[in-house]
A protein has these predicted regions:
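A generic "binding-loop/recognition-motif" signal
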Residues: 65, 84, 100-101, 110, ...
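Short acidic-glycine-tyrosine-enriched beta hairpin
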Residues: 83-101
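Basic/polar N-terminal segments that are highly enriched at the extreme N-terminus
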Residues: 1-21, 158-160
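Hydrophobic small-molecule pocket/channel-lining residues, especially in calycin-type beta-barrels
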Residues: 55-56, 63, 77, 126, ...
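A short glycine-rich, His/Asp/Glu-containing loop-to-beta-strand
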Residues: 20-60, 66-67
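Double-stranded beta-helix
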Residues: 107-160
């Protein structure tokens, strides 16, 4: 989408880390919502993912309506590219186009931090909020419940 104006506009926004909404998962992983789709005019979403050592994450899955990218800041998390798991190091970047099978976890003995960028900027945080609520309350989820949650947030699970 292009900007059609002639003079530009005052529209830049900034947020401090203290102002960012955070979510702590049952595993201890902290999701920091740096930029949500609602704050970027749905251009993209950017999250900072902070995982404790030896923490599971997302098994193989794909998305039909958005791409996802990962950039490792610290630690050695592992990423699944649809065929193999690779232990990454700081500076590693993974781009996953729509339909690309992927997953992530931190099976290393040290904490790991990475950025997750997705485009367009859908309300992806709702998926992680739901997972955190399920973990915090211990709510039982039937196969049908999981299927509904995955469908609502474009999370198509596969083996891997």
């Amino acid at each position: 989408m292009s900007y059609e104006g002639e003079l530009g506009e005052v529209s830049a926004t900034g947020v401090s880390q203290a102002e960012m909404r955070t979510l702590t998962m049952k595993s201890g992983t902290v999701a920091r919502f740096v930029a949500t789709g609602s704050s970027t005019r749905a251009d993209f979403g950017l999250y900072r993912w902070e995982m404790p050592a030896n923490t599971g994450g997302a098994t193989g899955h794909f998305h039909r309506t958005f791409s996802e990218s990962f950039y490792v800041l610290d630690g050695k998390p592992s990423f699944f590219d649809g065929e193999t798991w690779t232990q990454a190091e700081p500076g590693f970047f993974l781009y996953v186009p729509r339909g690309g099978i992927h997953g992530f976890r931190n099976d290393s003995p040290m904490p790991a931090t990475f950025l997750i960028l997705f485009s367009p900027g859908i309300a992806r945080e709702g998926y992680f909020e739901a997972l955190a609520e399920i973990g915090a309350t211990g709510r039982h989820m039937s196969k049908a419940d999981w299927a509904e949650l995955y469908a609502r947030f474009d999370q198509v699970m596969v083996e891997g």
